[in-house]
Curated annotation (Swiss-Prot):
GO biological process: ribosomal small subunit assembly; translation
InterPro entries from the UniProt entry: Ribosome_maturation_RimP, RimP_C, RimP_C_sf, RimP_N, RimP_N_sf
Keyword terms: Cytoplasm, Ribosome biogenesis
UniProt GO cellular component terms: cytosol
Record's protein name: Ribosome maturation factor RimP
UniProt keyword RNA-binding, yes or no: no
Pfam families listed in its UniProt record: DUF150_C, RimP_N
Subcellular location: Cytoplasm
Cross-referenced Gene3D superfamilies: Ribosome maturation factor RimP, C-terminal domain, RimP-like superfamily, N-terminal
Homology family: Belongs to the RimP family.
Function in brief: Required for maturation of 30S ribosomal subunits.
Primary localization: cytoplasm
Length: 183
């Protein structure tokens, strides 16, 4: 078993999804993990990867690498981020209804890059997927199969409104955190 298979077996055995695994020329191993929807984790509930999840996986992988004699200088375990890559059929199915950036291998109507809403083309994943995107003022649909895709990523959605609302809802005399000083 090579080191990538060992990493995948370990990560999935712990209940996480292995999103990506890369090795740089200088011995850096980067492992990107995600939580599986509907699973229960020792580190607590939620759909997003926590620092504690990364710590658990890091600890387990260090033991594995010692036993398997894997040569590396540094190990980084991280979440895939807000712009998570979509690689497998399961990734596309999981994020149906999400905004996605898709780069095609070959241009279609003079373009390779598309951004739009991800849908399933038919009743089964084998029938491919669709991207509903705006071209000018009208919606258009791009149908594609996974083997036509060079890269696909979620469009990052950052919402700061929740934090602002909490600050605005604070009682008038309550101290807010401003570098350890009260205002």
């Amino acid at each position: 078993m090579n080191w990538q298979q060992a990493v995948e077996t370990t990560v999935t055995g712990m209940g996480y999804e292995l999103v990506e695994c890369e090795r740089s020329a200088r011995g850096l191993l980067c492992v990107y993990i995600d939580r599986v929807p509907g699973s229960v984790y020792l580190t607590g509930p939620g759909e997003f990867v926590l620092v504690e999840d990364c710590e658990l996986v890091t600890r387990q992988l260090r033991y594995l690498f010692e036993v398997e004699n894997v040569d590396y200088s540094r190990l980084e375990v991280s979440s895939p981020g807000l712009d998570r890559p979509l690689r497998k059929v399961g990734d596309f199915l999981r994020f149906l209804g999400s905004d996605v950036d898709v780069t095609l291998k070959a241009p279609f109507q003079g373009r390779k890059n598309y951004r739009g809403l991800l849908r399933q083309a038919g009743d089964t994943p084998e029938q491919g997927f669709e991207l509903v995107f705006q071209d000018g003022k009208e919606d258009k649909v791009l149908g594609f199969a996974l083997d036509e895709v060079r890269e696909a990523r979620l469009v990052p959605v950052v919402d700061f409104k929740g934090r602002m609302r909490q600050t605005a809802d604070a009682p008038q005399g309550a101290a807010q955190e401003t570098g350890g000083h009260e205002e």
